[in-house]
Structure formats: structure tokens, C-alpha cells
Amino acid sequence: MRYQNMFETLKKHEKMAFIPFVTLGDPNYELSFEIIKTLIISGVSALELGLAFSDPVADGITIQASHLRALKHASMAKNFQLLKKIRDYNHNIPIGLLAYANLIFSYGVDGFYAQAKECGIDSVLIADMPLIEKELVIKSAQKHQIKQIFIASPNASSKDLEQVATHSQGYIYALARSGVTGASRILENDSSAIIKTLKAFSPTPALLGFGISKKEHITNAKGMGADGVICGSALVKIIEENLNNENAMLEKIKGFIGGMIF
């Protein structure tokens, strides 16, 4: 219900969803919590939180580095502790997890989704799991009332997009370009065709991710028919560049979010 409520409220005010991505536990668990509180206070629509992994193949160098920083002290037990703390801090904001398949399968699929539910998580996106393998997780997701999100890539066939649109819950993650994550100067591709195709198959909101780093990118995404954007690398870069100055980091994050939301 949290995603539904969020999108209904945004639609009423003719606003785009702005969802930031950060890696949980980067650069440490204490500061990670302060970063996430700052994001919430700054007015983001929802949270997308990555679970640190040793081989984040879908990510570019900025987010890879955040995984490495978090891995110095990360554990699944600590991840779930922090997630509970975040949910206790704010009961209404939608919280999504972005994880790599190996983390979930080594933990145990049903146990992972059960813990996610316990922590008040709303959705899970598995970065490196193709749609064809959805049956491996979908029963556990449904059992524990977690929305399973799938990725729509620019080179996907119409048939694949139909599957993504049909099976994604909460929202659909539409990639603005192929390749790995990373901030872009310009949005390289016109994603209006892929978004139009997704919307023909399902009313589930489509969010554009990969390369979102400027306000104009959000304006462009809106023009393409997207319901919102996911922004990761540009935000994680602020964390990376201010590791030695916590106050400056949080102020710059606040300023960045303030400049992106409209």
C-alpha cells in the first residue's frame, strides 16, 4: 500500500517520484542511518537501498566503491537491524531493497523475504536475476507480501516487456540506457517508446533509472512518460567525496535533493 499511496499522492499534485539509491552501511552503519534520515527529511518519495555485495556486476565504479566501503563491516544481521531502525524512524515511506541474487540465495530465499517483511520492507529488486528465473522468488515474495520488481532494459523485446510489466509490482524499473550504473551528462536514449509499451501492458508506474543526475533529466523523463526517476551514482558520489567531513556530506546531500525534487 505504501507505493500505491505514494503514487496516488504524487499524481494528485502532478509530481514525479524521486527515489534515491544508496548502499546500506556505506560508509558505516551509523553514518548510513544519518544519510538515510537526511534523504527522508529532504522529501524523497521512497528509498532504494542496496545490499553490499563483493561482485556488483550491474554497477559502475562509483557504486562499486560504495559496496566495497560497506563490505568492510557489513553483515546481513546488521543490514536487517539498520532496516528495522529506518522503518521505526518513518512508518510511511516506501522502502525497496536492491540486492544481488547470490546474497538472497545464500541466505535462503524464504528466510530473506520473511526478514524483509519483518523489517517493513515494501519491495525487492534482484539486479542480476533474469525474468525467466522469477519463479525462484515470486512465491516467497507473495507469501510475505513483498512487491517483486523487475527491470525493463532498452533492448528488450515487446514480449519481454509484457512479462516485466505483468509481473512487476509497486513499480517497473526502466533502464534509461544499457550497461552499468553511473551518472550521465545527458540522457542518451529516448525511452518514450519503452515506457509507452510498458504502459500498454500494465498500469504499474514506470520509473527511469541509470544516469539520472540533473534536474533536466527528470524533466526529460517526465516528457518520455515516466512516473518518476531513481537516482544513485550522483548521490553516492557526494558520499565518496565527503568521507572525511560528515556535516558537509549531509549538507551537500540535502542541497542535491532540494535541487532535484520539484
Curated annotation (Swiss-Prot):
Gene3D superfamilies (alphabetical): Aldolase class I
Keywords: Amino-acid biosynthesis, Aromatic amino acid biosynthesis, Lyase, Tryptophan biosynthesis
Pathway assigned to this chain's UniProt record: Amino-acid biosynthesis; L-tryptophan biosynthesis; L-tryptophan from chorismate: step 5/5
Annotated InterPro entries: Aldolase_TIM, RibuloseP-bd_barrel, Trp_synthase_alpha_AS, Trp_synthase_suA
Pfam families: Trp_syntA
Top-level lineage group: Bacteria
EC number from the UniProt entry: 4.2.1.20
Catalytic machinery residues: 48 (proton acceptor), 59 (proton acceptor)
PROSITE patterns: TRP_SYNTHASE_ALPHA (PS00167)
Biological process terms in GO annotation: L-tryptophan biosynthetic process
GO molecular function terms attached to this record: tryptophan synthase activity
Main EC class the enzyme belongs to: lyase
Catalytic activity, as annotated: (1S,2R)-1-C-(indol-3-yl)glycerol 3-phosphate + L-serine = D-glyceraldehyde 3-phosphate + L-tryptophan + H2O
Annotated signal peptide: none
Free-text function comment from the UniProt entry: The alpha subunit is responsible for the aldol cleavage of indoleglycerol phosphate to indole and glyceraldehyde 3-phosphate.
Family membership noted in the UniProt record: Belongs to the TrpA family.
Assembly and binders: Tetramer of two alpha and two beta chains.
Identification of the protein by name: Tryptophan synthase alpha chain
Natural source organism: Helicobacter pylori (strain ATCC 700392 / 26695)
Gene label: trpA
